[in-house]
Amino acid sequence: MGHSDNTNDGGILVPSIVEQPCGLYAGTEAFSGDYDADDYHDWVEQSNGDPVPAPLVVYLQDAACVDQRDQERAMGQELRMQGALFDGDRVLEQLILTGSIAETWSENQLHHLVSTIQASFPVDRQSLNNWCACVANTIPSGERLRLLRVLGFNHIRFALTASAPEAQLAITLADAVRQAKRLGFDRIILDLRRMPADTTLRNLLQSLDQKTKPDRIRMPLVGNQDPGIYAQAVQAIGFRYIGLDWYLCEDDSWWDAWKNGSLYWTMLGYSELHNPDVIGIGPGAISSVGGCYSLNDAPLSDYVAKLKQGRLPIVGGAELEPADLLRREIIAMILTSSCIRVSRLEEKWGIEFDRFFARESDRLRALERTNQVSRKTDGIDIHAQSQPQLIEICEIFESRPRHGSAAAAHTPSSKHVPLSKSYIVS
């Protein structure tokens, strides 16, 4: 069992739940091998001391292995160690299961896992509204959906592939959505990024109706094909586009948040939680606390060994400078507000935007000529909507661009101590 859909960034397998490429500024190429658990402890302590501590989010991912017992025990140990670091009054506000945990872990394993989570972090009734189980390899049975609901999961995310025959896929998905609605799942999410943009996808979308439609749909990148073919299929049943291939129903809380400016951007993508501390549990997981990222050991044997020694399995990470935090804030503005609030940034950061971002401003002026952006008195409006265009604009503000990006030719990457060769994926 495991998560085969992780993405490779600079030789590191990035967890599939982490938003690529705009969620992990400035990419794992900025990660350093001299960042360790002591640095992570310092950032957690700083976060605990904030007048209004950040919301807490935990996601869990597993690794491919024959015997899950060592992995299950190790992940439980990591949960307890992480929970002990954070102040006891900081409620866990979102929980996400990824990898194959929701699909293939046994009923006893899942019950034990949830018990460990609740013993490690404070959980209240409100936070249970944000428990999400992600399933990626198969559409779960009714019994599995019922178990997840009993355990407290209120959101279910189906990440479909084209492995099943077209007709069977549409019928099975419709049955699963109906069952999830009957069981009381509050949010049903359909992630189609691994579906090829062909007639199978179009027919699948057209098979949805008011009784079987999910609450959110993530569409794939459609390449050279006309995205209108796919957009029309979902818009016909009431979905609205917000950006980065996300379509929402108008009664979705994300839609209201997007309209009133309270939808935020995090390492995990769009969220109603503002600037949360994200704790990744499991082999190869990445955490984001304050201005730092930390990376867990990925080989399962090394991950388990460190936890048996009573150590967090952190093997690297990055600490962002103030300029990095400024750039990350601009990227979030682009993706959530379709604008760059220049006046607000100048007041908050004490900069003159066009001088501080002289090179970036030149590139934005070039995009004005193609009507992708436009200047106004106090800011810059973003008119681009497609994923490639939005990513191109975000990359303008990457001071430490990832390998192969459009910005890589303009700015050299920062120097750092490389990660252990045993970690890097060739």
Show where each model-derived region lies.
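C-terminal scaffold of the Radical SAM
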Residues: R69-G83, Q94, T98-P122, Q126-D354, ...
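A short, conserved structural fragment
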Residues: E368-D378
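Short, amphipathic alpha-helical interaction segments positioned at domain boundaries
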Residues: Q387-S426
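Short amphipathic alpha-helical interaction segments
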Residues: E352-A366
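Minor-groove-contacting beta-hairpin "wing" of winged helix-turn-helix DNA-binding domains
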Residues: G379-A384
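Extended hydrophobic-aromatic, low-complexity segments
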Residues: V342-R344, R355-F357, E392, S405
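Flexible, acidic/Gly-rich N-terminal and inter-domain linker regions that tether
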Residues: M1-Y59, A63-C65, R73-E78, Q82, ...
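Structured loops at beta-to-helix junctions and adjacent beta-edge loops in soluble globular domains
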Residues: Q61-A63, I281-G284, Q385
